[in-house]
């Protein structure tokens, strides 16, 4: 067993890179990828691609993600969360009714400017490093999609509201929280952020790590998720010996399937062989996998 998924739950207070480093040390010499960085102050689902599964990680990066986050109204911080320095204050706190009603304004495709404290690169340097050094960071606005946004709870005494968001890749929840507050004629920052789902990987099925000292290779491998799991809803064709050989060597391979398909996968003897597209019966591989039964 050397290629699979691990649905790990990242706790608050550790970076995504540090968590990957710990898992890699436990598993030994194996390639590991993940579906998108979670802030140090955030927690939640961080699916890890092990071995050949790294060839599919872009699918998870592109997948919908869901978050639950709490906004504290009345202040703005330089980082957009509780770890930053307060840079602005207002006495105006939005009403419960408005905190709920504002959600509909954000559903759909919207423009968002990533926060200065982000992992995006500016001239080869991470934006957050420039921001920490007090340098001005200019990031270009980008289009993102909010599929669903709703207020789950409003705490008048503490001036907070908790929201659920289902969104596209590239969405920054800290920026969404700030924009929500601004639309409510107030200021706000994130005090709690939890990613609850990435594609098929859900919070309730994630691996909780109480102590990193207790992790073993066996305990992780026992909770592996098959590499094909994220392909379950996608067309699959079974290859015979001749077709499999051609695909492995990058040769033209024909299938008895009349429809053109933009994205599909090929299985050989029950195992993932390749992903790609089908045009006029001809399979064009995007990625070929080196897996055994």
From Swiss-Prot:
Its EC number is 5.4.99.25. The active site is at residue 39. The keyword tRNA processing applies. Keywords: Isomerase, tRNA processing. Pfam families: TruB_C_2 (PF16198), TruB_N (PF01509). It is an enzyme of class 5 (isomerase). InterPro entries: PsdUridine_synth_cat_dom_sf (IPR020103), PsdUridine_synth_N (IPR002501), tRNA_psdUridine_synth_TruB (IPR014780), TruB_C (IPR032819). The keyword tRNA processing applies. GO terms for molecular function: RNA binding; tRNA pseudouridine(55) synthase activity. One of its GO terms (biological process) is mRNA pseudouridine synthesis. It comes from the Bacteria. It catalyses: uridine(55) in tRNA = pseudouridine(55) in tRNA. PANTHER family: PSEUDOURIDYLATE SYNTHASE TRUB1, TRNA-PSEUDOURIDINE SYNTHASE. HAMAP family: TruB_bact (MF_01080). Belongs to the pseudouridine synthase TruB family. Type 1 subfamily. Responsible for synthesis of pseudouridine from uracil-55 in the psi GC loop of transfer RNAs. This is tRNA pseudouridine synthase B.
